[in-house]
């Protein structure tokens, strides 16, 4: 029970001070493509030259150069999801990975400021795990169809309908939903999370296909919710079979946010990091990644000799994050991510249970 202090002399809550006021605004530097900028970014261009023509690099390089300088000046770190474009992933990010990796690494950063290059729920997760740090997202409109498919009120109704059944919630959700959750999961650890619970029945929400895929790997009864990723739900088994017929010997690597019929056609399925590790370890001659198409470009820069067939399904939300917006974040300190204190502690607990789960 919470006891409210109603004394007239109670100290008022401290006034909110914006990140811009706390850290100050930096004047916009020159973004000319000078010989010095070309020279200092040359090693980074080597990583992305297969995706960015030399004449276009003249527009990218000044932002890359300025961002990497501003990070040091601001004591900031950039966390980037595997779906970010190669210029962000390879040229300005300090930490890259899937949702689980980013959540874990967010707890280890020493920097005062976190710039989250991903969608909004990822930035919220970083804030939950780092309540004392300043977390910025370059574009607060970077949402997620899965996150928008369910609310905290929906979860409360599910708990009323299935009393005593533990709730496993995908991290692709808002803090409001996480606050109603027993434990979070990602696509890389969902089976381990489900198996860690003593109950024979588990609510696995909101991604219906992820839940259906994990149901095939466990003896527990899995209850689902009809949320879907707008990128992965577009893939079909017929489409992948057509690729196989047209490309004999091709290996298909899928993401468990796809329909189970799609996963059944794949040679391997796993989280984005699992997919990356599979390609790096197996080095297939030709491979098709059944996921957001920027990831194939990001791996291709690191894995030579592998032919990537790219069915290009783009995430419009991830693509809201751009170099100019990252640059503006570091200059103006806007789009700060805050979590309502009324739900933050409960949401944090669900994420921490996942992060601390023994694998």
UniProtKB/Swiss-Prot annotation:
Q: Any one Gene Ontology biological process term?
A: 'de novo' NAD biosynthetic process from L-aspartate
Alphabetically list the UniProt keywords: 4Fe-4S, Cytoplasm, Iron, Iron-sulfur, Metal-binding, Pyridine nucleotide biosynthesis, Transferase
Which cofactors does this protein require? [4Fe-4S] cluster
What is the top EC class of this enzyme, as a single word? transferase
Would I find tRNA processing among this entry's keywords? Answer: no
Major localization class: cytoplasm
Any Pfam family from its record, for instance, is NadA
| Functional pathway | Cofactor biosynthesis; NAD(+) biosynthesis; quinolinate from iminoaspartate: step 1/1
- Residue sites binding [4Fe-4S] cluster per the record: 144, 229, 315
Do the record's keywords include Transferase?
Answer: yes
Q: Which reaction does it catalyse?
A: iminosuccinate + dihydroxyacetone phosphate = quinolinate + phosphate + 2 H2O + H(+)
What InterPro entries has UniProt attached to this entry? NadA, NadA_sf, Quinolinate_synth_type2
Where is this protein localized, as stated in its record?
Cytoplasm
Q: How is the cofactor bound?
A: Binds 1 [4Fe-4S] cluster per subunit.
Gene Ontology MF terms in the entry: 4 iron, 4 sulfur cluster binding; metal ion binding; quinolinate synthetase A activity
**Residues holding iminosuccinate:** 81, 99, 170-172, 187, 255-257, 272
* SUPFAM superfamilies, sorted: NadA-like
A single GO cellular-component term from the record reads: cytosol
> What's the Enzyme Commission number for this chain?
2.5.1.72
Similarity remark: Belongs to the quinolinate synthase family. Type 2 subfamily.
Give the protein's biological function. Answer: Catalyzes the condensation of iminoaspartate with dihydroxyacetone phosphate to form quinolinate.
According to UniProt, the name of this protein is Quinolinate synthase
User: What organism does the UniProt record list as the source?
Assistant: Sinorhizobium medicae (strain WSM419) (Ensifer medicae)
């Amino acid at each position: 029970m919470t006891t409210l202090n109603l004394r007239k002399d109670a100290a008022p809550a401290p006034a909110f001070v914006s990140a811009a006021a706390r850290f100050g605004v930096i004047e916009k530097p020159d973004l000319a493509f000078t010989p010095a900028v070309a020279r200092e970014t040359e090693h980074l261009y080597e990583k992305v030259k297969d995706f960015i023509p030399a004449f276009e690099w003249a527009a990218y390089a000044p932002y890359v150069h300025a961002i990497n300088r501003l990070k040091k000046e601001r004591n900031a770190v950039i966390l980037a999801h595997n779906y970010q474009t190669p210029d962000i992933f390879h040229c300005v990010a300090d930490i890259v990975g899937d949702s689980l990796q980013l959540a874990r690494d967010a707890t280890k950063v020493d920097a005062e400021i976190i710039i989250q290059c991903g969608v909004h729920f990822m930035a919220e997760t970083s804030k939950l795990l780092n309540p004392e740090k300043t977390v910025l997202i370059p574009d607060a409109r970077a949402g997620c169809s899965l996150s928008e498919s369910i609310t905290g009120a929906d979860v409360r109704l599910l708990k009323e309908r299935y009393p005593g059944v533990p709730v496993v919630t995908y991290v692709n959700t808002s803090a409001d939903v996480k606050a109603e959750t027993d434990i979070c999961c990602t696509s890389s650890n969902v089976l381990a999370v489900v198996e860690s619970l003593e109950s024979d029945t588990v609510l696995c929400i909101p991604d219906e296909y992820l839940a259906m895929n994990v149901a095939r790997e466990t003896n527990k009864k899995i209850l689902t919710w009809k949320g879907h990723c707008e990128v992965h739900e577009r893939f079909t088994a017929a489409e992948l079979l057509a690729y196989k017929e047209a490309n004999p010997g091709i290996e298909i690597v899928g993401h468990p946010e796809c329909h189970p019929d799609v996963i059944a056609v794949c040679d391997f399925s796993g989280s984005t990091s699992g997919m990356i590790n599979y390609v790096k370890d197996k080095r297939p001659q030709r491979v098709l990644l059944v996921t957001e198409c920027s990831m194939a470009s990001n791996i291709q820069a690191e894995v030579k000799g592998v032919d990537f067939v790219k069915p290009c399904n783009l995430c419009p939300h991830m693509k809201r994050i751009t170099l100019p917006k990252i640059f503006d974040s570091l200059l103006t300190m806007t789009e700060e991510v805050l979590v309502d204190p009324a739900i933050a502690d409960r949401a944090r607990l669900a994420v921490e249970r996942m992060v601390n789960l023994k694998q």
